[in-house]
């Protein structure tokens, strides 16, 4: 092939940044039989939600022995239920070696642990009051004027998401903060995706396939008891999603 021909040849791929919705499995200990039984129970609550999803194993709260971690069995169990384990989060050095052996991606922890406060020195001289720092401006809301159609995903990584149109079945909307839908919400809405438990979801007609706040979710069947096909707000109270009609909020 000539140099000019090689120059004109297009590359076979291009790397781009992407934002995707991932589900994390927060593992406390691992026993394969119990793991599969718990997994089967979760899937039975929302079979459509779990089908062919990518999954991250989070080890931030893992209390079992590292020697009990069998990622190969974990991957196989999940795969039998059409769930695809793609990586491990917040692993220590030994856990990282086990994860590498199972060809899993390694991700950092979701949040940093707090450091213990240091004791103040005895008889410390009072310091002059520092000038107050300017308050951080809240992240601007992302505003969508068009309907969000089936197969589309709209993501607000820092603030609220405001949609001035319907969200169709099969669509997905995600936000770090609140989600406002000025129309029917028929797809999936995930608010507080970085862990903000104060986030809320507002819509003019609740017909959603799934609503999630800070990882706590309800599927369509669970949402139909209160406020179905009416204007509601949804918030998290004591780790449970609570639906309140807007005329009673």
UniProtKB/Swiss-Prot annotation:
The keyword Iron does not apply. It holds the Pfam family MinC_C. One of its GO terms (biological process) is cell morphogenesis. Residues 118-141 have a biased composition (Low complexity). Residues 115-141 are annotated as: Disordered. InterPro entries: CAP/MinC_C, MinC, MinC_C_sf, MinC_N, Septum_form_inhib_MinC_C. Keywords: Cell cycle, Cell division, Septation. The keyword Cell cycle applies. PANTHER family: SEPTUM SITE-DETERMINING PROTEIN MINC. Belongs to the MinC family. Interacts with MinD and FtsZ. Cell division inhibitor that blocks the formation of polar Z ring septums. Rapidly oscillates between the poles of the cell to destabilize FtsZ filaments that have formed before they mature into polar Z rings. Prevents FtsZ polymerization. This is Probable septum site-determining protein MinC.
């Amino acid at each position: 092939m000539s140099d000019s021909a090689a120059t004109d040849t297009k590359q076979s791929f291009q790397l781009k940044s992407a934002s995707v919705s991932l589900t994390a499995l927060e593992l406390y200990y691992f026993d394969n039989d119990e793991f599969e039984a718990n997994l089967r129970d979760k899937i039975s609550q929302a079979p459509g939600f779990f089908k062919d999803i990518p999954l991250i194993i989070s080890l931030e709260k893992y209390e079992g022995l590292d020697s009990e971690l069998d990622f190969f069995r974990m991957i196989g169990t999940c795969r039998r239920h059409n769930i695809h384990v793609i990586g491990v989060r917040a692993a220590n050095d030994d856990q990282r070696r086990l994860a590498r052996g199972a060809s899993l991606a390694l991700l950092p922890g979701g949040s940093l642990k707090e450091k213990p406060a240091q004791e103040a020195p005895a008889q410390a001289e009072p310091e002059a009051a520092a000038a107050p720092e300017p308050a951080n401006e809240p992240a601007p809301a992302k505003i969508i004027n068009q309907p969000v159609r089936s197969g589309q995903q709209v993501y607000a990584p820092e603030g609220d998401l405001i949609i001035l149109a319907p969200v169709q079945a099969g669509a997905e909307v995600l936000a770090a903060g609140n989600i406002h839908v000025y129309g029917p919400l028929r797809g999936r809405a995930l608010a507080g995706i970085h862990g903000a438990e104060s986030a809320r979801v507002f819509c003019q007609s609740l017909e959603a396939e799934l609503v999630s706040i800070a990882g706590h979710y309800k599927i369509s069947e669970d949402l139909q008891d209160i406020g179905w096909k009416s204007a509601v707000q949804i918030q998290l109270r004591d780790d449970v999603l609570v639906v309140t009609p807007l005329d009673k909020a």
